[in-house]
Amino acid sequence: MAGVLALACAAEGAFAACNTPATQVTDAALTTLLSGNTVCAARGGDRWQEEHQAGGALWDYKLGDADPVDPRTQVGTWSVTEAGTASVVTYDYGTGSQSYEIWDDGGSYSFCQAGVVNVDNATVVSGINVGCP
């Protein structure tokens, strides 16, 4: 799927959401934010909803379990490195991994690499197998 975070590497914006006044999500707070929850994001015409299963499995909700054409499926793995301001979430879709800092801008989130926004305005929905609004 073209919308997965690993394929979203072109810079979406400048430095605005990868520094203050946004707050970097670090250490255990990063694991708490993602584990057992769904990240909802969009860029251009692509939209995705990735479920961060406890234990590290990463699922794309797509159109849900009941959809015969585009059901939810595992797309890779995720993990968190808790290291203060060097804390990152790493995604592996089977073709190599990508690591991102996550910045909280008041309830929407930016996924950043080297201070550059790759995905912005992402939201987190509580739970898995719930889809995004």
Task: Please tell me what each predicted stretch does.
Residues 13-75, 81-133:
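Lipid interaction determinants
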Residues 2-10:
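Bacterial N-terminal signal peptides
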